Amino acid sequence: MQFPSACRRSAAAFAAVTAVILSGASTPAFAAQDPVKYVNLGDSYSAGWGSLAPTAAVNPAFGSPACLHGGPDDVALLDQLQSVALTGDYACAGATVGATTSGIPTIAQQAAKASLDGALNSTTGLVTLTAGGNDVNFGQIIAACAADTSPQATGCQAAAAYGVQLANGVDVAGTVGTIRGYAANAKIAWLGYPRLFATAGESTTVIAGGGVMSAAAAAVFDKGTDQLNAVLAAKARSAGAQFVDVATKFNGHEIGSSGSWFNLGQYTQFNFHPTADGYSKGYYPAMVSAIKPAQLVKG
Protein backbone atom coordinates (compact mmCIF):
# COMPACT_ATOMS: atom_id res chain seq x y z
CA MET A 1 0.00 0.00 0.00
CA GLN A 2 1.32 3.42 -0.94
CA PHE A 3 1.16 6.34 1.55
CA PRO A 4 0.88 9.92 0.37
CA SER A 5 4.12 11.80 1.10
CA ALA A 6 2.64 13.70 4.08
CA CYS A 7 1.41 10.46 5.60
CA ARG A 8 4.78 8.82 5.07
CA ARG A 9 6.45 11.71 6.94
CA SER A 10 3.95 11.40 9.80
CA ALA A 11 4.52 7.67 10.03
CA ALA A 12 8.27 8.16 10.08
CA ALA A 13 8.02 10.78 12.80
CA PHE A 14 5.80 8.53 14.90
CA ALA A 15 8.25 5.65 14.47
CA ALA A 16 11.13 7.87 15.58
CA VAL A 17 9.30 9.01 18.70
CA THR A 18 8.33 5.43 19.51
CA ALA A 19 11.93 4.34 19.18
CA VAL A 20 13.06 7.00 21.64
CA ILE A 21 10.42 5.98 24.17
CA LEU A 22 11.23 2.28 23.86
CA SER A 23 14.95 2.96 24.18
CA GLY A 24 14.38 4.52 27.62
CA ALA A 25 15.64 7.97 26.60
CA SER A 26 13.73 10.94 27.98
CA THR A 27 13.32 14.48 26.76
CA PRO A 28 11.45 17.01 28.91
CA ALA A 29 8.38 18.39 27.23
CA PHE A 30 8.78 21.79 28.90
CA ALA A 31 11.66 23.68 30.42
CA ALA A 32 11.64 23.53 34.20
CA GLN A 33 10.27 26.63 35.88
CA ASP A 34 11.98 28.02 38.95
CA PRO A 35 9.71 29.33 41.72
CA VAL A 36 9.50 33.07 42.20
CA LYS A 37 12.00 34.30 44.79
CA TYR A 38 10.16 36.01 47.61
CA VAL A 39 11.14 38.38 50.44
CA ASN A 40 8.86 39.57 53.25
CA LEU A 41 9.30 42.86 55.12
CA GLY A 42 7.10 44.87 57.44
CA ASP A 43 5.59 45.34 60.88
CA SER A 44 3.81 42.99 63.29
CA TYR A 45 1.04 42.19 60.81
CA SER A 46 3.74 40.92 58.45
CA ALA A 47 5.59 39.16 61.26
CA GLY A 48 2.84 36.72 62.24
CA TRP A 49 2.46 38.48 65.57
CA GLY A 50 -0.22 36.71 67.58
CA SER A 51 -0.49 33.58 65.44
CA LEU A 52 0.92 31.45 68.27
CA ALA A 53 0.14 33.64 71.27
CA PRO A 54 1.67 33.70 73.83
CA THR A 55 4.68 32.52 71.81
CA ALA A 56 7.05 34.93 70.09
CA ALA A 57 10.70 34.74 69.17
CA VAL A 58 13.66 36.68 67.87
CA ASN A 59 13.60 36.87 64.10
CA PRO A 60 16.70 34.85 63.07
CA ALA A 61 17.22 37.19 60.13
CA PHE A 62 18.41 39.79 62.66
CA GLY A 63 19.26 37.64 65.67
CA SER A 64 18.40 40.51 68.00
CA PRO A 65 15.54 41.06 70.47
CA ALA A 66 14.96 44.34 68.66
CA CYS A 67 13.29 42.30 65.91
CA LEU A 68 10.61 39.90 67.13
CA HIS A 69 8.14 37.85 65.17
CA GLY A 70 5.34 35.41 65.93
CA GLY A 71 4.51 32.00 64.55
CA PRO A 72 3.53 30.57 61.17
CA ASP A 73 1.41 32.96 59.15
CA ASP A 74 0.36 33.92 55.64
CA VAL A 75 4.01 34.29 54.64
CA ALA A 76 4.76 30.70 55.63
CA LEU A 77 1.68 29.50 53.75
CA LEU A 78 2.73 31.39 50.64
CA ASP A 79 6.15 29.78 50.87
CA GLN A 80 4.50 26.35 50.77
CA LEU A 81 3.30 26.96 47.22
CA GLN A 82 5.40 25.26 44.56
CA SER A 83 5.50 28.55 42.66
CA VAL A 84 7.11 30.45 45.57
CA ALA A 85 10.48 30.23 47.34
CA LEU A 86 10.92 32.45 50.40
CA THR A 87 14.51 33.70 50.46
CA GLY A 88 14.12 35.88 53.55
CA ASP A 89 11.58 37.06 56.13
CA TYR A 90 12.77 40.31 57.72
CA ALA A 91 9.54 41.59 59.27
CA CYS A 92 9.70 42.91 62.84
CA ALA A 93 6.89 43.63 65.27
CA GLY A 94 6.71 47.37 65.88
CA ALA A 95 8.47 48.35 62.65
CA THR A 96 7.81 51.72 61.08
CA VAL A 97 8.35 53.40 57.75
CA GLY A 98 9.80 56.52 59.34
CA ALA A 99 12.94 56.75 61.44
CA THR A 100 12.59 55.81 65.10
CA THR A 101 14.64 55.65 68.29
CA SER A 102 13.11 52.32 69.34
CA GLY A 103 15.91 50.24 67.86
CA ILE A 104 13.41 48.20 65.86
CA PRO A 105 14.60 47.97 62.24
CA THR A 106 12.60 50.23 59.94
CA ILE A 107 11.33 48.94 56.62
CA ALA A 108 14.30 50.53 54.85
CA GLN A 109 16.70 48.90 57.30
CA GLN A 110 15.00 45.54 56.80
CA ALA A 111 15.43 45.89 53.05
CA ALA A 112 19.08 46.84 53.47
CA LYS A 113 19.72 43.78 55.64
CA ALA A 114 17.95 41.55 53.14
CA SER A 115 20.14 42.96 50.38
CA LEU A 116 23.30 42.50 52.46
CA ASP A 117 22.33 38.88 53.08
CA GLY A 118 21.83 38.31 49.36
CA ALA A 119 18.12 37.60 49.81
CA LEU A 120 16.89 40.76 48.08
CA ASN A 121 18.38 41.36 44.64
CA SER A 122 17.68 41.56 40.93
CA THR A 123 16.43 37.96 40.88
CA THR A 124 13.77 38.64 43.52
CA GLY A 125 10.32 38.37 41.97
CA LEU A 126 8.06 39.29 44.89
CA VAL A 127 8.26 41.49 47.99
CA THR A 128 5.38 41.82 50.46
CA LEU A 129 4.96 44.10 53.46
CA THR A 130 2.50 45.72 55.82
CA ALA A 131 3.56 49.06 57.22
CA GLY A 132 2.16 52.41 58.29
CA GLY A 133 0.09 51.42 61.32
CA ASN A 134 2.84 52.20 63.79
CA ASP A 135 3.61 55.47 62.02
CA VAL A 136 0.09 56.70 62.79
CA ASN A 137 0.24 55.66 66.47
CA PHE A 138 -2.16 52.76 66.12
CA GLY A 139 -2.00 51.84 69.81
CA GLN A 140 -2.64 55.38 71.01
CA ILE A 141 -5.71 55.69 68.81
CA ILE A 142 -7.14 52.47 70.26
CA ALA A 143 -6.52 53.79 73.77
CA ALA A 144 -8.17 57.13 73.00
CA CYS A 145 -11.21 55.45 71.46
CA ALA A 146 -11.52 52.95 74.31
CA ALA A 147 -11.57 55.80 76.82
CA ASP A 148 -14.18 57.80 74.93
CA THR A 149 -17.71 57.33 76.30
CA SER A 150 -19.27 60.37 74.64
CA PRO A 151 -22.39 59.67 72.53
CA GLN A 152 -20.72 60.68 69.26
CA ALA A 153 -17.24 59.45 70.23
CA THR A 154 -15.83 62.92 69.64
CA GLY A 155 -12.51 62.15 71.31
CA CYS A 156 -12.12 59.05 69.18
CA GLN A 157 -12.97 61.07 66.09
CA ALA A 158 -10.21 63.55 66.89
CA ALA A 159 -7.66 60.79 67.46
CA ALA A 160 -8.64 59.02 64.24
CA ALA A 161 -8.49 62.25 62.26
CA TYR A 162 -4.99 62.91 63.56
CA GLY A 163 -4.04 59.39 62.54
CA VAL A 164 -5.19 60.05 58.98
CA GLN A 165 -3.18 63.27 59.01
CA LEU A 166 -0.10 61.27 60.02
CA ALA A 167 -0.87 58.69 57.32
CA ASN A 168 -0.61 61.40 54.69
CA GLY A 169 3.00 61.87 55.76
CA VAL A 170 4.03 58.19 55.54
CA ASP A 171 6.75 57.95 52.90
CA VAL A 172 5.38 55.06 50.89
CA ALA A 173 7.03 56.23 47.67
CA GLY A 174 10.43 56.44 49.33
CA THR A 175 10.01 52.97 50.80
CA VAL A 176 8.96 51.46 47.49
CA GLY A 177 11.87 53.23 45.83
CA THR A 178 14.30 51.81 48.36
CA ILE A 179 13.04 48.28 47.80
CA ARG A 180 13.07 48.80 44.04
CA GLY A 181 16.69 49.92 44.27
CA TYR A 182 17.64 46.49 45.58
CA ALA A 183 15.14 44.44 43.59
CA ALA A 184 14.41 46.18 40.31
CA ASN A 185 12.40 43.30 38.88
CA ALA A 186 10.24 42.49 41.88
CA LYS A 187 6.50 42.87 42.21
CA ILE A 188 5.98 44.87 45.42
CA ALA A 189 2.73 44.19 47.28
CA TRP A 190 1.81 46.54 50.13
CA LEU A 191 -0.83 44.87 52.29
CA GLY A 192 -3.51 46.77 54.16
CA TYR A 193 -5.01 46.32 57.62
CA PRO A 194 -8.29 44.66 58.65
CA ARG A 195 -11.06 46.41 60.54
CA LEU A 196 -10.68 45.41 64.18
CA PHE A 197 -14.10 45.86 65.73
CA ALA A 198 -17.56 44.46 65.11
CA THR A 199 -20.09 47.22 64.64
CA ALA A 200 -23.81 47.46 65.28
CA GLY A 201 -25.98 45.91 62.60
CA GLU A 202 -23.60 43.19 61.42
CA SER A 203 -25.21 39.76 61.43
CA THR A 204 -22.28 38.24 63.35
CA THR A 205 -21.95 41.00 65.95
CA VAL A 206 -22.34 39.83 69.53
CA ILE A 207 -21.24 43.10 71.11
CA ALA A 208 -20.31 46.15 69.06
CA GLY A 209 -16.79 47.21 69.93
CA GLY A 210 -16.10 43.86 71.54
CA GLY A 211 -16.37 45.32 75.02
CA VAL A 212 -13.22 47.33 74.33
CA MET A 213 -14.96 50.51 73.26
CA SER A 214 -18.45 51.84 72.68
CA ALA A 215 -20.40 51.03 69.54
CA ALA A 216 -19.96 54.63 68.40
CA ALA A 217 -16.21 54.56 68.96
CA ALA A 218 -15.88 51.19 67.20
CA ALA A 219 -17.56 52.61 64.11
CA VAL A 220 -15.24 55.62 64.17
CA PHE A 221 -12.15 53.45 64.62
CA ASP A 222 -13.10 51.13 61.76
CA LYS A 223 -13.75 54.13 59.52
CA GLY A 224 -10.28 55.39 60.44
CA THR A 225 -8.82 52.04 59.38
CA ASP A 226 -10.58 52.36 56.03
CA GLN A 227 -9.15 55.85 55.63
CA LEU A 228 -5.64 54.66 56.50
CA ASN A 229 -5.95 51.88 53.94
CA ALA A 230 -7.18 54.33 51.32
CA VAL A 231 -4.19 56.62 51.88
CA LEU A 232 -1.71 53.75 51.76
CA ALA A 233 -3.40 52.30 48.67
CA ALA A 234 -3.22 55.57 46.75
CA LYS A 235 0.41 56.11 47.72
CA ALA A 236 1.42 52.53 46.90
CA ARG A 237 -0.21 52.55 43.48
CA SER A 238 1.26 55.95 42.67
CA ALA A 239 4.70 54.53 43.50
CA GLY A 240 4.19 51.54 41.20
CA ALA A 241 3.40 48.98 43.88
CA GLN A 242 0.28 46.86 44.29
CA PHE A 243 -1.99 47.43 47.26
CA VAL A 244 -3.70 44.35 48.69
CA ASP A 245 -6.96 44.97 50.52
CA VAL A 246 -7.56 42.44 53.30
CA ALA A 247 -10.45 44.11 55.12
CA THR A 248 -13.24 42.27 53.30
CA LYS A 249 -11.71 38.88 54.15
CA PHE A 250 -12.14 39.71 57.85
CA ASN A 251 -15.78 40.77 57.57
CA GLY A 252 -17.77 38.99 60.26
CA HIS A 253 -14.64 38.04 62.19
CA GLU A 254 -13.83 41.27 64.01
CA ILE A 255 -13.45 41.66 67.77
CA GLY A 256 -16.96 41.41 69.19
CA SER A 257 -18.22 39.04 66.50
CA SER A 258 -19.31 35.45 67.04
CA GLY A 259 -16.14 34.15 65.38
CA SER A 260 -13.32 36.61 65.98
CA TRP A 261 -9.96 36.14 64.25
CA PHE A 262 -8.18 38.51 66.63
CA ASN A 263 -6.31 38.12 69.89
CA LEU A 264 -7.89 39.80 72.89
CA GLY A 265 -7.09 38.58 76.37
CA GLN A 266 -4.44 38.16 79.01
CA TYR A 267 -1.51 38.13 76.57
CA THR A 268 -1.86 41.83 76.01
CA GLN A 269 1.18 42.27 73.76
CA PHE A 270 -0.68 40.28 71.09
CA ASN A 271 -4.03 42.03 71.49
CA PHE A 272 -5.55 43.51 68.32
CA HIS A 273 -3.46 41.25 66.10
CA PRO A 274 -4.75 38.31 64.06
CA THR A 275 -4.87 34.78 65.40
CA ALA A 276 -3.64 31.87 63.29
CA ASP A 277 -7.08 31.86 61.63
CA GLY A 278 -6.74 35.54 60.84
CA TYR A 279 -3.50 34.97 58.99
CA SER A 280 -4.53 31.75 57.25
CA LYS A 281 -8.16 32.62 56.43
CA GLY A 282 -7.86 36.40 56.13
CA TYR A 283 -4.44 37.54 54.97
CA TYR A 284 -3.38 34.46 53.02
CA PRO A 285 -6.35 34.18 50.63
CA ALA A 286 -6.29 37.95 50.10
CA MET A 287 -2.61 37.73 49.13
CA VAL A 288 -3.01 34.79 46.77
CA SER A 289 -6.09 36.26 45.10
CA ALA A 290 -4.47 39.64 44.50
CA ILE A 291 -0.85 38.71 43.84
CA LYS A 292 -1.41 35.51 41.82
CA PRO A 293 2.10 34.20 42.56
CA ALA A 294 1.95 31.43 39.94
CA GLN A 295 1.79 34.10 37.24
CA LEU A 296 5.11 35.54 38.46
CA VAL A 297 6.99 32.32 37.72
CA LYS A 298 9.36 32.52 34.78
CA GLY A 299 10.70 29.60 32.79
Please place each PLM-identified region on the residue numbering.
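Structural recognition of the beta-strand scaffold that forms the well-ordered cores
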Residues: 37-49, 86-91, 125-130, 135-137, ...
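Catalytic His-Asp segment of secreted/periplasmic serine-dependent ester chemistry enzymes
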Residues: 194-299
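Short amphipathic alpha-helices and their capping/turn segments at secondary-structure boundaries
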Residues: 26-39, 104-128, 172-187, 288, ...
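Secretory targeting and sorting signals
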Residues: 1-31
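A structural motif corresponding to the C-terminal end of an alpha-helix
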Residues: 74-86, 170-188, 224-245
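Serine-esterase "nucleophile elbow" of acetyl-processing enzymes
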Residues: 32-93
